[in-house]
Amino acid sequence: MFYEIAQITKVLISPVSWIVLLIIIPYFLNARRKWLCRSCWIVAGVMFLVFSNKPLMLYTEGQLAGEYSNTSMKDGKTYKAAIVLGGFAKMDAERGNLTYESRRAGRLWEAVRLWKMGRVERILITGDTSSSLKDGVTTKPEFIKYMTQIGVPDSVLIIEQLARNTRENATNSKAILDSLGINTADCVLVTSATHMRRSYETFRKAGLEVDYYASDTYSAPKSLSFRDFYPRWKCVQEWQYLFNELFGRIIYDVVGYG
């Protein structure tokens, strides 16, 4: 039930939903309420200008990332596993390749980079939607084959497919690590910088004494030009991700997950 409510809420808090709703509402209002129609369109226009503003979006992203844009990994330490939060791609079973989510794909590649550098021994991917289809048929073999083709052997990978949210990422990961006899203090959590605070606090609350390493880190632009303020529809869509994270933090604090 918690998962279903979260999915519905994502739609309700989306700036895209607000703008579209304000545009279409006037068509269902009485023609005599022209002032209300105009008001809806004006508000929709103002919201579009605000949420299509890239500098504002980047500033908000930086505030959400905060101190978690850095890493708490210890110099010279080799970790038993990197725990990567899923949702970064979808698996095309017919073509055997991945379609990446632009904001999340860095999680996987940073974990692979850490492994190639010898900083981690294994990679645990939790809540990996790229390895399962809607009808429940697993594409895990295709995913492992793909990773093998890019140089990551299957012996390195641990794939957990059941987690649907950050809380389940934590509890399911702990169960797997405990079964393998891996101390969670020897693991590092890898996810997006804006998602790291909620993830890290949730994992710690679930009993995982992990360090963290953020991907997709934020860096403030050194200078701004007039063109930086041009409206961008992509920015409106990306606010969805930021609102989801902000709302998620509030909910996790309320229910005691974080």
What is each stretch, according to the model?
Residues 1-29:
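Membrane-embedded alpha-helical segments of integral membrane proteins
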Residues 1-9, 56, 60-64, 239, ...:
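Hydrophobic alpha-helical segments of integral membrane proteins
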Residues 11-18, 45-49, 148:
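Hydrophobic alpha-helical membrane-embedded or membrane-associated segments
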Residues 25-34, 52:
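Structural signal for the C-terminal ends of transmembrane alpha-helices
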Residues 39-53:
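Hydrophobic membrane-insertion alpha-helices, especially the h-region
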Residues 50-232:
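A structural signal for short, hydrophobic/glycine-enriched beta-strand patches
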Residues 218-227, 235-258:
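Extracytoplasmic/luminal low-complexity segments enriched in Pro/Gly and acidic/polar residues
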